[in-house]
Amino acid sequence: MKRRDLIRLVENNGCILVRHGARHDWYQNPQTGVCQPIPRHREIKEALAKHIIKMLKD
């Protein structure tokens, strides 16, 4: 999955960018308080993308 597509999905679920790390961007779901890093790679493996989406859902 492309990184920009994953970020679009995460932001459409109501998550916000918390901070820019050295190699990852951290997104948080404000309703649950869960934070999850998203790596800065053009391509993100499908299994990792599914895990990130699962963790940041409501």
Regions found by a protein language model. Give the residues of each.
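Basic nucleic-acid-binding interfaces
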Residues: 1-20, 28-58
